[in-house]
C-alpha cells in the first residue's frame, strides 16, 4: 500500500512539511520530475535486464555494498526473505514455507485472527526459526499499526462499528475506510491511547508476539500519517501526525525489546517519513525499512492466480523518487528491503537486478502473498 508521488505531494502540502520529498542525503522532489532522468533510468534498467547473464548478475550483486550490512541491526545479515500473510495454518502450508532457504520470513500471527484463536503461533514460529540446513532464520510478525482490521480478535463485533462516509466508527479513533480498496481495513487515530493500549504494555500485542518467539515486527500503514482523514483528526487533536507516528514506532520497539533485547522493527512504505521528522529522529527507532511497488505492483485484493495482482509498472518518476528516499535510509546504515509484485518475464529479473545493484534486499511475489513466491531470488 504505497502512495503515488502526486498523492504524497498533496498530503505533504496538507501537513505543511517543508522537508517532504527532499531532505538530507537525497534528491529534491523537483529533481525527480525530469522526464529525461526517468527515461534514462528506465532505459538503463531495461538494458541491464536484457543483457546480463546469471553469472554477471551474481557478480554485480556481490560487488555492491549491501545497505546496513555492517550495522548493528539484528537484520544486518539477512540477504533473502519471504513475505507470506495467508494460508499458513496447516502443517503442509507451514512445511512448504519452512523448506525454503530464506534468511527471514514475514508472516501473520495466526491466533490474532477471529476463529483462529487456538492456532499454535508459537509452535509455527519455533518451526520456522530453523532452516533445513540447521542454520537460524529470522521470523517477523506482520502487524498493521495504522489501521484497525475488523477480522482481528481485538475487534469486538457487538461494540466496534465501521466508519461511514460522514462519521467515524466506534470507537471513534476508527476514522475512515482504506483508500486503496482493502476490505475490512480502517485507518485510525494511532496516537489515541485506546489504540496504543492494544499494542503496548506487558499484556499488549507486541509483548505477546515477542513471547511467542517472533524476532520482530513488520509495520504496515506507517503511511497513515499522510491520509487526509488522519491529518484532519490530528489537526483537531493538536497532534503532529508524523511525529506521533515515530513516537508510536519507538514505543512498539521498546515494548518488544523489554522481552527480547534484539527485537527488530521494520517499517513498510512511507519512505518520506525520514524527511518529515529527520533522520536523527526516525532511524534510531528502526532496524530496517521495506518498500512495496518500487518497480511493479498489483490490485488490492487480487487472488494468487489473478493476473491483476502482478506486473503493473510503477511510473518511472515515482520509482526514481522512491529509490532516492530509500537511499537516505541506506546512507543512515539501515537495511533496505524491497517487495514487488511481478510474474511475467523479464520483470522479476529487472527487479532483482536493479534492486541488488542499489544495495537493497529484493523479493518478487504476487500481491495476495498467500504462497511462497514462484519467482524466488535464487532464480535470478
Model features per residue range: what roles?
Residues 66, 70-170:
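N-terminal carbohydrate-binding/catalytic regions of secreted carbohydrate-active enzymes
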Residues 266-301, 345-363:
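Substrate-binding cleft/loops of secretory-pathway carbohydrate-active enzymes
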Residues 21-24:
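Bacterial signal peptide processing site
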Residues 320-380:
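Substrate-binding cleft of secreted/luminal carbohydrate-active enzymes
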Residues 142, 242-276, 334-341:
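Aromatic-lined carbohydrate-recognition surfaces of secreted/lumenal glycan-active proteins
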Residues 82-99, 195-210, 272-278, 347-351:
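Short, acidic/polar
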Residues 16-19:
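C-terminal motif of bacterial Sec signal peptides marking the signal peptidase cleavage site
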Residues 149-204:
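Active-site-adjacent "subsite" loops/lids of carbohydrate-active enzymes
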Amino acid at each position: 500500500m504505497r502512495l503515488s508521488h502526486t498523492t504524497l505531494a498533496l498530503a505533504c502540502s496538507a501537513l505543511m512539511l517543508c522537508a517532504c520529498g527532499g531532505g538530507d542525503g537525497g534528491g529534491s522532489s523537483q529533481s525527480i520530475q525530469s522526464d529525461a532522468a526517468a527515461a534514462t533510468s528506465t532505459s538503463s534498467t531495461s538494458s541491464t535486464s536484457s543483457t546480463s547473464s546469471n553469472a554477471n548478475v551474481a557478480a554485480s550483486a556481490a560487488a555492491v555494498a549491501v545497505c546496513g550490512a555492517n550495522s548493528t541491526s539484528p537484520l544486518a545479515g539477512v540477504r533473502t526473505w519471504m513475505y507470506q500473510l495467508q494460508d499458513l495454518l496447516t502443517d503442509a502450508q507451514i512445511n512448504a514455507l519452512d523448506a525454503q532457504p530464506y534468511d527471514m520470513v514475514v508472516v501473520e500471527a495466526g491466533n490474532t485472527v477471529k476463529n483462529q484463536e487456538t492456532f499454535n503461533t508459537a509452535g509455527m514460529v519455533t518451526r520456522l526459526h530453523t532452516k533445513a540446513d540447521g542454520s537460524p532464520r529470522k521470523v517477523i510478525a506482520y502487524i498493521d499499526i495504522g489501521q484497525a482490521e475488523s477480522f482481528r480478535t481485538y475487534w469486538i463485533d457487538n461494540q466496534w462499528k465501521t466508519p461511514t462516509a460522514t462519521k467515524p466508527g466506534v470507537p471513534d479513533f476508527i476514522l475512515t475506510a482504506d483508500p486503496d480498496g482493502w476490505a475490512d481495513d480502517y485507518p485510525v487515530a494511532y496516537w489515541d491511547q485506546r489504540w496504543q493500549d492494544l499494542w503496548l504494555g506487558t499484556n499488549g500485542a507486541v509483548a505477546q508476539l515477542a513471547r511467542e518467539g517472533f524476532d520482530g515486527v513488520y509495520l504496515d500503514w506507517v503511511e497513515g500519517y499522510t491520509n487526509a482523514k488522519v491529518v484532519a483528526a490530528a489537526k483537531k487533536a493538536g497532534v503532529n501526525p508524523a511525529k506521533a507516528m515515530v513516537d508510536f514506532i519507538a514505543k512498539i520497539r521498546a515494548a518488544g525489546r523489554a522481552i527480547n533485547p534484539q527485537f527488530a522493527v521494520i517499517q513498510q512504505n512511507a519512505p518520506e517519513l525520514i524527511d518529515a521528522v529527520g533522520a536523527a529522529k526516525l532511524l534510531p527507532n528502526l532496524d530496517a525499512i521495506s518498500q512495496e511497488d518500487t518497480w511493479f505492483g498489483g490490485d488490492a485484493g487480487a487472488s494468487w492466480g489473478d493476473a491483476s495482482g502482478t506486473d503493473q509498472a510503477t511510473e518511472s518518476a515515482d520509482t526514481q523518487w522512491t529509490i532516492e528516499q530509500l537511499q537516505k535510509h541506506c546512507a543512515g546504515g539501515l537495511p533496505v528491503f524491497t517487495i514487488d509484485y511481478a510474474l511475467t518475464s523479464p520483470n522479476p529479473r529487472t527487479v532483482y537486478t536493479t534492486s541488488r545493484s542499489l544495495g537493497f534486499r529484493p523479493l518478487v511475489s504476487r500481491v495476495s502473498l498467500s504462497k511462497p513466491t514462484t519467482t524466488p531470488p535464487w532464480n535470478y
